[in-house]
């Protein structure tokens, strides 16, 4: 029996689908996406699972054989079931953006632009699913949600009369086919640098995964939004041949800059689309790299047909935790790759902050260890004072992570507790007239330590410290 036949057989008999035994309810289909998941089959059956799907029969506990469906391509079946269960319902226009850095900002700028121009727009990704200014409840923290959560959210957005959506596509999400069944009206690419190599194994495999957005997800009638400034532009243009293509770039592209000035509050810019000036004024967002993200967002908006000529760019705001300015000298940014950290640090000088720079950062545990070296080197080269602290150590020994970073920035100050590190850095920066960058966690509201989720937010820690100092 092929996948389509199995879907037709099961979809009308099920009350829900999940790959998490803890989410099973009576009448659900429980899909074992890994061999380890078979160990939770008894829990799923006890909770009322009507069908059990597995890739093979090996290791399955004894259950009623009428409940078991064996499908060697159980991952594909899972995504197909998720799409069909929610009737492939989604907003009229869905743009999907991929790339190492910038995805969240692009999606957020798109949502802001659509809303500011009188449309019902939404974004979905690392910050959650946001409609207008309201974040929807979610059970996931993934950039690209699990297939069931994704299609459930898409269906909810449709029910809320959302017409335009821009969502992020992570490399994990692409590799695990979480976007199966999404009808992408546009696919956009930001940039490529090293990340998640612990998962993908090599830059070649990482890049190949990113390309799947254009070869497997973007519809034949869809639009490819390509970064003309990127090294990957030529390869992606060939991959997108036969589809509509909109290019963007600082110096060249259908959407490009004609003028750029910067200050400590952001930028003043002139933007052209196909040779026509569509905006001349302020862009009140910090970060030189945010210019490229804005241009990408404008290209997506142009592809959507919602209108790109009267966009109030001067009313755009930084996404939460993305070059977020607190007071006049403290910036919080999500930078968690060496490339992103370099861009964040160099942007401070580029914007004309006259002060020296204090940097607070760490690296995540159970993730690509090579980043500890490269981020340490960037910190040592571009920051005047470096404070190494804990990020999300997860199951690793935090001290080991810090030591591996400090091998490459020998003069760094080590303060294990992130709250203590921020308190020290805020006091140091204000008393010595430095500018402070706190990198790595951005908008996150928890810290993952030894299997526990501890409530913590960089911005909250900064504001508490400023309040104690009666500075703000």
Curated annotation (Swiss-Prot):
The keyword ATP-binding appears for this protein: yes
Xref: Pfam families: Mur_ligase_C, Mur_ligase_M
Q: Does the keyword ATP-binding apply?
A: yes
Q: Where does ATP bind?
A: 99-105
EC number, as in UniProt = 6.3.2.13
The GO terms describing molecular function are:
ATP binding; magnesium ion binding; UDP-N-acetylmuramoylalanyl-D-glutamate-2,6-diaminopimelate ligase activity
Q: What residues bind meso-2,6-diaminopimelate, as annotated?
A: 367, 391-394, 440, 444
| Binding, UDP-N-acetyl-alpha-D-muramoyl-L-alanyl-D-glutamate | 21, 143-144, 170, 176, 178
Cofactor(s) recorded for this entry are:
Mg(2+)
Residue(s) carrying N6-carboxylysine: 210
User: What biological processes does GO assign it?
Assistant: cell division; cell wall organization; peptidoglycan biosynthetic process; regulation of cell shape
**PTM statement from Swiss-Prot or TrEMBL:** Carboxylation is probably crucial for Mg(2+) binding and, consequently, for the gamma-phosphate positioning of ATP.
Q: Protein name, please?
A: UDP-N-acetylmuramoyl-L-alanyl-D-glutamate--2,6-diaminopimelate ligase
Species of the source: Anaplasma marginale (strain St. Maries)
What is the primary gene name for this protein? murE
């Amino acid at each position: 029996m092929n996948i389509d036949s199995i879907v037709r057989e099961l979809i009308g008999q099920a009350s829900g689908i999940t790959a998490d035994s803890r989410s099973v309810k009576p009448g659900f289909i429980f899909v074992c996406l890994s061999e380890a998941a078979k160990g939770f089959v008894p829990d799923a059956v006890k909770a009322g699972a009507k069908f059990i799907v597995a890739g093979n029969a090996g290791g399955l506990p004894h259950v009623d054989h009428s409940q078991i469906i064996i499908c060697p391509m159980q991952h594909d079946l899972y995504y197909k079931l998720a799409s069909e269960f929610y009737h492939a319902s989604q907003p009229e226009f869905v743009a999907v953006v991929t790339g190492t850095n910038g995805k969240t900002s692009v999606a957020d700028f798109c949502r802001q632009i659509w809303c500011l121009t009188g449309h019902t727009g939404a974004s979905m990704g690392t910050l959650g699913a946001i409609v207008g200014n309201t974040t929807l409840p979610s059970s996931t923290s993934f950039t690209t949600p699990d297939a069931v959560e994704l299609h459930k959210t898409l269906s909810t957005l449709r029910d809320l009369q959302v017409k335009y959506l821009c969502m992020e596509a992570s490399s994990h999400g692409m590799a695990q086919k979480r976007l199966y069944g999404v009808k992408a009206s546009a696919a956009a690419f930001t940039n490529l640098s090293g990340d998640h190599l612990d998962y993908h194994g090599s830059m070649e495999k990482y890049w190949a995964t990113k390309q799947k957005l254009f070869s497997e997800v973007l519809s034949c009638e869809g639009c490819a939004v390509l970064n003309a400034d990127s090294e990957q532009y030529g390869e992606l243009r060939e991959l997108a041949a036969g589809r509509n293509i909109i290019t963007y770039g600082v110096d060249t592209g259908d959407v490009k800059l004609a003028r750029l000035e910067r200050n400590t509050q952001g930028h003043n810019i002139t933007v052209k689309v196909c040779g026509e000036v569509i905006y001349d004024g302020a862009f009140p967002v910090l970060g030189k790299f945010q210019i490229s993200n804005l241009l990408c967002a404008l290209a997506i908006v142009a592809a959507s047909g919602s209108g790109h000529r009267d966009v109030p760019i001067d009313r755009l705001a930084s996404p939460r935790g993305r070059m977020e300015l607190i007071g006049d000298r403290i910036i919080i940014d999500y930078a968690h790759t060496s490339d992103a950290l370099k861009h964040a640090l160099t942007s401070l000088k580029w914007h004309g902050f006259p002060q020296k720079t204090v940097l607070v950062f760490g690296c995540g545990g159970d993730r690509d260890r090579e980043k500890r070296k490269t981020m340490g080197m960037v910190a040592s080269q571009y920051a005047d004072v470096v404070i190494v602290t804990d990020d999300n150590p997860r199951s690793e020994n935090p001290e080991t992570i810090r030591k591996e970073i400090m091998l490459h920035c020998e003069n760094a100050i080590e303060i294990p507790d992130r709250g203590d590190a921020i308190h020290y850095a805020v006091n140091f920066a204000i008393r010595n007239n430095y500018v402070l960058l706190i990198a790595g966690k951005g908008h996150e509201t928890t810290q993952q330590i030894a299997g526990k989720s501890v409530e913590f937010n960089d911005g909250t820690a900064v504001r508490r410290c400023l309040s104690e100092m009666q500075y703000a």
